[in-house]
Amino acid sequence: MALWGGRFSQAADQRFKSFNDSLRFDYRLTEQDIVGSVAWSRALVTVGVLSETEQQQLEDALNVTLEEVRTAPEAILASDAEDIHSWVEQCLIDKVGDLGKKLHTGRSRNDQVATDLKLWCRAQVTELLGAIHLLQQALVMTAEAHQDVVMPGYTHLQRAQPITFAHWCLAYSEMLARDESRLRDTLTRLDVSPLGAGALAGTAYAIDRDKLAGWLGFASATRNSLDSVSDRDHVLELLSYAAIGMVHLSRFAEDLIFFNTGEAGFIELSDRVTSGSSLMPQKKNPDALELIRGKCGRVQGALTGMMMTLKGLPLAYNKDMQEDKEGLFDALDTWLDCLHMAALVLDGIQLKSPRCREAAQQGYANATELADYLVARGIPFREAHHIVGEAVVEAIRQGVPLETLPLARLQAFSPVIDEDVYPVLALASCLAQRKAKGGVAPEQIAQAIAEAKQRLA
């Protein structure tokens, strides 16, 4: 049964009905719709629309419906109901008869769906926070296990300065911490209930909306009924945060894909997260990571799509807003899946420490140390930078590491260079000198790991 048939003399064309119906995706709001309906039935008691006996009948029937859905969710999609609100109402009428027709008194699908979606978003944020927490833990545990694995750090995909694999892991842990912070921040704005806003002008019944909000676990009710049903900021926020989070995971995936190449050879991925080739027997492809990288695009697309949907809408509900759900559901599902997959990839990763160290000693990654050495002896940094550049050119010409150039040759570039330069150019020294907060010095890495573990405990 449609919820709006009285105005029409002709039935909807089946092609339009298929185009218009949303049950195939908004069925995911079933639990939220039922929970919201229970709260609304209680509110109707306070204004005399329902007796307490009637309300209890409705609540019992709604709870039975919820249990039925949990047992056999496929029953929803077998229905020809227009949307989840229609489906729940019809289930109620089937169970309690005409009493079920009283539930929608004073309520619009406009405030109903806005409430359902906020309730769903809150639950999804909680699940995402859990997945982010688990991935952060995996990164910190991996960092702790590989504090001594030295590898090259890159800028412009060229070797730049030595770092450790632990430092790399902790960098992504920091990104995830920002993702977590953003999600926690949006919970504040999700904590306001639109239920009772009606179609756009508010409800004609003297319902205490703040009390109603409290029954649903919200901190308060919205202040303006027109904004309440027009607002999809929370959808845009979550899509934005998902887009940012997926960019982080895409960069994580790209780094590991590169580290896994034969050209880099820093890591070995587990067989559990790789696949082979149908033609080339030797192949072991990083499919899990490539899919994480690829799925980033679909999440960015969902954000762009929703922004374009909302940008020209007049206030109050428009059917365009039905398009808010599929992209949101898919984007947050994708983000959640990728968070879990990233943790699985880390779980089986193997570091090739000798190769990492070898690469860190190549590419003149200790050149900055020589510049700092000169600065410590009174040479202005810009001049020191130029001197070291000349020394690097000479080392390249000879095909040798910077630290193997004879002292006499180094002194030709600057007479202040002495024998004590060679320990400075050693790999261990390159790390040890970076002891300011956030640097790669061993004591800083150990402290960062300890602090991260404390935050995640």
UniProtKB/Swiss-Prot annotation:
Gene Ontology MF term list: argininosuccinate lyase activity
A GO BP annotation: L-arginine biosynthetic process
First-tier enzyme category under EC: lyase
Highest taxon above the source species: Bacteria
Sorted UniProt keywords: Amino-acid biosynthesis, Arginine biosynthesis, Cytoplasm, Lyase
Pfam family membership, one: Lyase_1
TM ranges: none
Family matches, as InterPro entries: Arg_succ_lyase_C, Argininosuccinate_lyase, Fumarase/histidase_N, Fumarate_lyase_CS, Fumarate_lyase_fam, Fumarate_lyase_N, L-Aspartase-like
SUPFAM superfamilies named in the record: L-aspartase-like
Catalytic activity: 2-(N(omega)-L-arginino)succinate = fumarate + L-arginine
EC number, as in UniProt: 4.3.2.1
Compartment annotation: Cytoplasm
CDD domains linked to this entry: Argininosuccinate_lyase
Major site of localization recorded for this protein: cytoplasm
HAMAP family per the UniProt record, alphabetical: Arg_succ_lyase
Membership in a protein family: Belongs to the lyase 1 family. Argininosuccinate lyase subfamily.
Name of protein: Argininosuccinate lyase
Organism encoding this protein: Sodalis glossinidius (strain morsitans)
Taxonomic classification: Bacteria, Pseudomonadati, Pseudomonadota, Gammaproteobacteria, Enterobacterales
